[in-house]
């Protein structure tokens, strides 16, 4: 027999698929269940009550100890609820499959909202659900291409070009360093630079890193185009879990340009000077090692601007990989200029 309280207990009640929430007063669990079913026009048989917070079922035994103003959920036969986790799951499903109704509702709420924090949350929600991620061509998503040259006809092509441009920029920096190399070693420096250039051309300047249509081993994103921040150079991962999909909309494309391909072992401070020093030493340089440090994911991390630390990394190249193993005769070293000998003074007779 269910316990009947002398004074009614007031709770806030909602149904699983309803955004409405009502205050209901009842002296027993069964009375509350019956009133809730009437309010939401649901069948009583098979229905039950649970705590909205964690999904704990409300029974006759625990009803008397239920605090006033508790938030309860009314479930019908076959429905389940696991607390806030269920609400978060439902919210995430909106991001995967946005509906016009959700977008319209978010816009309406945003237009009426005055609180800055709620405005921010609604704006972020609207930004994400409005993305046209699956679209690829200019015809399918013309707004994404606003401000871009007409030669770019699809998103993957532009993102590939964007990555290639970054890698080409690194190559120009390596080339510009030749002025710092001794004149006797410049020919060898140019030879190494030429080898790197040919290698980059063969892999299309690693533009596949930003291309969601590339092979999984050659890209830094998911097949849908989601990129995750790999964290600062001195951490294994991003503690803030930054992520972005530049394929989604124009704003995301522009924001993605602020993300950095950061060299773990620094390019300007360490890698290029070490390369120049090794060439000037006269031994045969393992240029493929330096290539991997300068232009590949072996030494590059994709990072959100907040995770891009501008401090000195204080990391050095692997000395065991700088030169090729000497299997035969050592490559002839470039001649070094010797200081002129001073003649001894003649003795006066």
Curated annotation (Swiss-Prot):
SUPFAM superfamilies, alphabetized: CAD & PB1 domains, His-Me finger endonucleases
Enumerate the CDD domains for this protein: CIDE_N_CAD
Q: What is its main location?
A: cytoplasm
Annotated region Disordered: the residues are 319-349
How might one describe the regulation of this protein's activity?
Answer: Inhibited by DFFA (DFF45).
- Please name the GO terms that the record assigns under molecular function: disordered domain specific binding; DNA binding; DNA endonuclease activity; DNA nuclease activity; enzyme binding; identical protein binding; nuclease activity; protein domain specific binding
Q: How does it assemble?
A: Heterodimer of DFFA and DFFB. Interacts with H1-1.
Give the protein's recorded name.
DNA fragmentation factor subunit beta
Q: Which organism is it from?
A: Rattus norvegicus (Rat)
């Amino acid at each position: 027999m269910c316990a009947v309280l002398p004074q009614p207990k007031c709770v806030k009640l909602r149904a699983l698929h309803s955004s409405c929430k009502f205050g209901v007063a009842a002296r027993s669990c069964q009375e509350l269940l019956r009133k809730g079913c009437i309010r939401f026009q649901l069948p009583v048989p098979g229905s039950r009550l649970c705590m909205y917070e964690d999904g704990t079922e409300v029974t006759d035994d625990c009803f008397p100890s239920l605090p006033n103003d508790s938030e309860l959920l009314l479930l019908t036969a076959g429905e389940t609820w696991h607390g806030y986790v269920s609400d978060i799951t439902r919210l995430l499903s909106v991001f995967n499959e946005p509906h016009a109704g959700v977008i319209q509702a978010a816009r309406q709420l945003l237009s009426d909202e005055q609180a800055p924090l709620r405005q921010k949350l609604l704006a972020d929600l609207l930004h994400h659900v409005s993305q046209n991620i699956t679209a690829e061509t200019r015809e399918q998503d013309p707004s994404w291409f606003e401000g871009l040259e007409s030669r770019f006809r699809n998103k993957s092509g532009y993102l590939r070009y964007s990555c290639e441009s970054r890698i080409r920029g690194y190559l120009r920096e390596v080339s510009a360093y030749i002025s710092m190399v001794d004149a006797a070693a410049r020919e060898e420096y140019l030879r190494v630079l030429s080898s790197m250039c040919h290698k980059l051309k063969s892999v299309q300047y690693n533009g596949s890193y930003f291309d969601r249509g590339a092979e999984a081993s050659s890209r830094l994103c998911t097949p849908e185009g989601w990129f995750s921040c790999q964290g600062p150079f001195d951490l294994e991962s991003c503690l803030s879990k930054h992520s972005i999909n530049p394929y989604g909309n124009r704003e995301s494309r522009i924001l993605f340009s602020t993300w950095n391909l950061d060299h773990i072992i620094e390019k300007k401070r360490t890698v290029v000077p070490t390369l120049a020093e090794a060439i000037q030493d006269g031994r045969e340089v393992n240029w493929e090692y330096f290539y991997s440090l300068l232009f590949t994911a072996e030494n590059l991390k994709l990072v959100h601007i907040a995770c891009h630390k501008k401090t000195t990394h204080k990391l050095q190249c692997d000395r065991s990989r700088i030169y090729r193993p000497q299997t035969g005769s050592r490559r002839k070293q470039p001649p070094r200029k010797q200081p002129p000998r001073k003649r001894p003074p003649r003795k006066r007779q």
